Amino acid sequence: MYEVLQRDGLSIDLLERLSYKSELGISLKKNLHYFNKDDIFEEISKINEWYDEFEELYELALDYRIKSIQSAILKYERYYPDHQARKVFDDLLGFRSLCDNYDNILILNSIPEIRIADMSKGKANDDGYRGVHAYFQLSNRHYPIEIQYNTYYDRQFNNWLHKYIYKKKFDNNIGLRLRIMYENAKIQNEDDFKEAMKHVLSDCKGY
């Protein structure tokens, strides 16, 4: 199972060193209302600076991103007050990796520090996204690190969803209908996606 991480240049040792321990004195399993908002965003700002200076990140041949303060604030406002801090701020550092299938990724769940979110068949409230996310968390005082795994087939569609659907805050059903069309080969490229989106949004029955 460790080979899955090693393939991308990751290891438990590296993920441990990339794990930031909160100095707020509160378990990150606690809901957001237990935290002082100014304190938590001051800490997130420190985390961003810490990752910016972490040279080993630049050496990885793997896509990664450090979550912006603005994005973290939006997520906070969306989930305050009754969501756990560790689940709201579970992607301050996020990696993206491609895989041939999800079976090998799911076995990462055997690693004690890793929690798996299996969306390979969709989310509970299906919006068309497909993938498996692994969350490495060293302890309840450490912020999780997210690793997103997608097949190439799913990554292509997910990218179109993100570009054209998510930021416009359309109903989840729009993404799901487009996903069904993608799986039925009615969408094969980005132009097809845009054309199909127009029809779905206008609810064109004849498409």
Regions found by a protein language model. Name each.
Residues 76-90:
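Short, charged/polar, low-complexity loop and linker segments
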Residues 12-18, 46-57, 98-107, 191-193:
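Short low-complexity stretches enriched in small and charged residues
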Residues 1-46, 148-207:
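An acidic, glycine-/histidine-flanked metal-binding catalytic module
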Residues 86, 91-93, 98-189:
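Long beta-strand-rich cores associated with HINT superfamily self-processing modules
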Residues 35-80:
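Surface-exposed, low-hydrophobicity interaction/linker segments
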